[in-house]
């Protein structure tokens, strides 16, 4: 049986790690596999350098935004990553909507997207207790080709 390094969602096989010829880079990948909070720009560059991204499982995630931003996303054909290097996503649609509602928007649009699990990691810059959920980050732009469903929502009380 092949040894696997588990990062909650991100897995490396021995063959994948064997591609990483630089010892320091391999060590960094293993450290990130053991502690996902260590994932950084260096990790992303190593993954890109050795073509380790687009393999493995995919899961559905949700990205919420305002209607205005949703229109721009559809025009541009992409959900662009932010200044912090990724696109914030959640595992449930209502969780994603909370991040828009907290900014004073009672209505919005939710994009359900299918993404490579290897490009997703927990974002530790959000207070889980405050938001009532974990936030995740996808480490690249999300082309609208990865959108499976678009829904409008409202948090207004009737």
Please give the residue ranges for each predicted region:
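ADP-ribose/NAD+-binding catalytic cleft of ART/PARP-like enzymes
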Residues: 5-85, 101-102
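Short helix/loop capping segments that flank catalytic or ligand/cofactor-binding pockets
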Residues: 72, 97-99, 122-123
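Short, intrinsically disordered low-complexity segments
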Residues: 89-107
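Active-site and NAD+-binding cores of ADP-ribose-processing enzymes
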Residues: 8-32, 40, 80-82, 104-158
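Short, flexible beta-strand-to-coil junctions
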Residues: 64-70, 91, 113-119
């Amino acid at each position: 049986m092949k040894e696997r390094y588990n990062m909650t969602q991100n897995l490396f096989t021995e063959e994948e790690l064997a591609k990483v010829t630089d010892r320091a880079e391999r060590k960094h990948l293993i450290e990130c596999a053991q502690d996902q909070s260590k994932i950084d720009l260096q990790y992303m560059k190593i993954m890109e350098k050795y073509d380790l991204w687009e393999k493995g499982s995919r899961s559905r995630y949700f990205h919420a935004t305002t209607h205005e931003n949703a229109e721009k996303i559809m025009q541009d054909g992409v959900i662009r990553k932010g200044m912090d290097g990724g696109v914030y996503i959640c595992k449930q649609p209502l969780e994603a909507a909370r991040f828009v509602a907290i900014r004073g928007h009672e209505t919005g649009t939710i994009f359900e997207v299918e993404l490579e699990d290897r490009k997703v990691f927990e974002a530790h810059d959000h207070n889980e207790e405050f938001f009532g959920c974990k936030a995740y980050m996808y480490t690249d732009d999300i082309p609208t080709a990865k959108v499976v469903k678009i829904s409008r929502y409202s948090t207004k009380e009737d």
